[in-house]
């Protein structure tokens, strides 16, 4: 029978059903409370991220299409929390799987502020961890932009890439080369490759002095000669009076990182990669930390755009 560690005591998850657990109003023998937090290594989610056709991991939940769903607290870097009562609802095979990642909590481990607000205070709130917060901000931002301008800044992903948003996440371990590359690829497809180039192009004012200067730097006489989505986006920003070279440079660097996978980084072209290593601090921090920072900067990018173009909707929170 699958078991869970609760304060170093093993309990049978299969037997700890809702009707056998204690709650804040009724004690049921020595059995623990329904909402007792059970801790798991965050790698427990890898199985579900890797099979998006069958499973969905989202802010506060993980589930199997048409079979089961589980409330979770995934607003942490290295672990996931599940209230004990929900574990009892899993089918036996899933209980065994989760058991393999069960850990006893350390002193600094606890329920996130997000989960506390939702579970204890029964209030709605945004997640705080970079990947979850970015995905929430991205959807909200694109909707606000379309409401404001009549067209979305980011187009929907093509069918074969629809899973990219669904599975986009921070790393569950400090370093995972293949997963790091996969997340950078997903981020690039979701943001940079999805720029609504047709609508962006139509809004560029070639007579704007800043646009003229930008085109001259590229040896172009018209914005219609621009091919890359980022180039068009930068010209659009200049046309609107927004000059944010650092923000655009960040997007370009992410795109370059996408083009330089682990295999490329192991090549001899170190000079081509030196600036990327330095910019993202890939030699100083773990891939997990680097990716989290990229998510944070992507959120900052969206907030910067919202503050400039839609100040009436901006909450200025990062």
Regions found by a protein language model. Name each.
Residues 1-75, 87, 92, 105-253, ...:
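Amphipathic alpha-helical interface elements
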Residues 95-100:
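A eukaryote-biased signal for long
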Residues 204-208, 275-280:
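Short linear capping/connector segments at secondary-structure termini
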Residues 256:
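Basic, Gly/Ser/Thr-rich N-terminal segments that form RNA-phosphate-binding interfaces in CRISPR RAMP
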Residues 259:
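Cytosolic nucleotide-binding catalytic cores of signal-transduction proteins
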Residues 262-274:
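Substrate-binding/catalytic groove segments of enzymes
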Residues 277-294:
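Short secondary-structure subsegments characteristic of cysteine-rich extracellular domains
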């Amino acid at each position: 029978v699958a078991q869970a560690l609760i304060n170093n005591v093993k309990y049978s998850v299969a037997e700890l059903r809702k009707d056998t657990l204690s709650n804040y109003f009724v004690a049921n023998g020595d059995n623990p409370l329904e909402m007792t937090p059970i801790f798991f290594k965050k790698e427990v989610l890898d199985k579900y991220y890797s099979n998006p056709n069958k499973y969905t991991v989202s802010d506060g939940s993980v589930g199997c299409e048409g079979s089961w769903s589980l409330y979770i607290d995934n607003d942490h870097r290295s672990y996931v929390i599940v209230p004990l009562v929900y574990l009892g609802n899993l089918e036996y095979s899933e209980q065994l799987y989760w058991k393999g990642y069960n850990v006893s909590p350390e002193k600094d481990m606890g329920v996130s502020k997000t989960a506390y607000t939702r579970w204890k205070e029964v209030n709605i709130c945004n997640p705080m961890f970079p990947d979850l917060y970015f995905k929430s901000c991205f959807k909200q931002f694109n909707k606000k932009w379309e409401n404001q301008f009549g067209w979305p800044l980011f187009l929907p992903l093509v069918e074969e890439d629809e899973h990219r948003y669904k599975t986009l996440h921070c790393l569950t371990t400090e370093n995972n080369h293949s997963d790091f590359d996969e997340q950078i690829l997903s981020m690039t497809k979701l943001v940079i490759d999805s720029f609504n180039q047709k609508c962006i192009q139509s809004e560029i004012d070639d007579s704007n002095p800043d646009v003229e200067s930008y085109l001259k730097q590229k040896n172009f006489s018209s914005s219609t000669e621009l091919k890359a989505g980022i180039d068009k986006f930068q010209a659009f920003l200049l046309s609107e009076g927004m000059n944010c070279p650092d923000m655009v440079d960040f997007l370009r660097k992410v795109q370059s990182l996408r083009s330089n996978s682990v295999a490329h980084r192991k090549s001899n072209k170190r000079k081509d990669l030196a600036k990327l290593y330095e910019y993202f601090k890939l030699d100083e921090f773990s891939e997990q930390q680097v990716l989290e920072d990229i998510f944070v900067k992507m959120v900052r990018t969206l907030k910067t755009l919202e503050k400039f173009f839609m100040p009436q909707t901006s909450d200025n929170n990062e």
